[in-house]
Amino acid sequence: MIPHHLITLVGPTASGKTSLGVAIAAALSGEIISADSRQVYRRMDIGTGKDLSEYTLPDGSSIPYHLIDIANPGEVYDLFHWLAAFRTSYQDILNRGKTPLLVGGTGLYVETALRGDSLSNAPQNERLRKDLYNLSHEDLKDILRRYGGTPRTDIGSVRRTIRAIEIAAYYARYPEQDPWKKLNATVKTQGNEAQNSPLILCIQLPREERVRRIGERLKKRLEEGLIEEVEQLIASGVPTERLIQYGLEYRFITQHLLGELSREEMIARLEIAIRQFAKRQMTWFRGMGRRGYTLHYLDGTQSTDRLCQEALEYICLKARGQTQLTSSLS
């Protein structure tokens, strides 16, 4: 077991997080905890990029993974559910003497886990919801921004953004009940000692390479049956409005299947939306640096073997209390 009890690997979509996470886990006798808000759902495989075959190693053994395929499509499974499951999986991995690796691109989930938050489920405010229900998604996000701070839930849909406003409004009125403010005060008093700071690796890509990978991956997923996956979800009874709320692939393909978008329009809009999503992901991760976290950036244009070597070097250096890689890795 390494001294750091949790290694975190983040990065934008299409950056190769899964393959690198598996390589690191194989080297450290580790297990992967997925930090992806959509991979929790069964039968949403292609669109969420589960890539489960990558968890199988060349020798036929497999890297155990957690928080993938644990809920049914259409079921409400939000940050509160995920955090509870994360804690259970994390403790179970430690109890068995293994190394947990938190791997994913949902920044809110990652940061909530790293903060160790004990989230208080702010009560529903039906009057506020009624006032917000008819506003556009952009208007809702503008309202949320006025509260400042980090959203307490994913804001990828109207429903989730309304919930985020509901939570922000509650804690603005009752700041003494805000668990995040209590935690921030604790962090400030603890300082920034190495033993208290999480070990975070972040894959980054040049914009042109990120755009290229997103385009190639979307084409590949369409060839693998992405549209058919959404058709099967609808046929099984998953409400179309719920699929639209899941965003990106599920939103645009559902709109295409409903006749609202042609195939060409769907692909064009989806690719743009994925690019914008990847940009937002990196904005979140860079923002973590401003919020007191130290991220070690990895050049995602390198091979998985090279990235794994650098990651393991950095992990060993952190374990010895150092922060800089040797020149051989420059």
Residues covered by each model-derived region:
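Phosphate/pyrophosphate-binding catalytic cores of soluble transferases and nucleic-acid-acting enzymes
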Residues: M1-S330
